[in-house]
């Protein structure tokens, strides 16, 4: 099985440039999302994680800590590292990390076309399909 590790960083860390590059590659270049949509005010206050396989940065994500749950956002695995189980392993590590901090639920707004990936990670659809940045999304949650 593939192994990954996560590195928690903040917005002002020099390594945030990796996150910028990953978001541009995945969201702007692949999904044609406007660069203006890739970064927002939440970036200043949320938890950011780089995803590594060995010394290679393979992806990133951010977590917004809410009152009683966490919200997974902007999870992106670089194209050449997909289909290697990194995303699922990453979610398991995030659940473990935040469970130790007494959180027991994670929510996310999945791009509709990748919702089955999140289902395999234990997420359940909730609510109706909605549009964000011109792409269909669905709210999902997972208790842990």
Predicted regions and their residues:
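Helix-loop element at the rim of GNAT/NAT acetyltransferase active sites that forms part
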Residues: 9, 21-34
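Conserved catalytic-core motifs of GNAT/GCN5-like acyltransferases
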Residues: 107-109, 119, 124-139
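Conserved GNAT acetyl-CoA-binding A-motif
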Residues: 98-110
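Conserved beta-strand in the GNAT
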Residues: 50, 56-64, 71-76
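A conserved beta-turn-beta hairpin within the catalytic core of GNAT-like acetyltransferases
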Residues: 65-73, 82, 132-137
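Conserved acetyl-CoA pyrophosphate-binding loop and the N-cap/start of the following alpha-helix
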Residues: 81, 85-93
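A short beta-loop-alpha structural element at the N-terminal edge
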Residues: 2-19
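Conserved beta-hairpin
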Residues: 35, 42-59
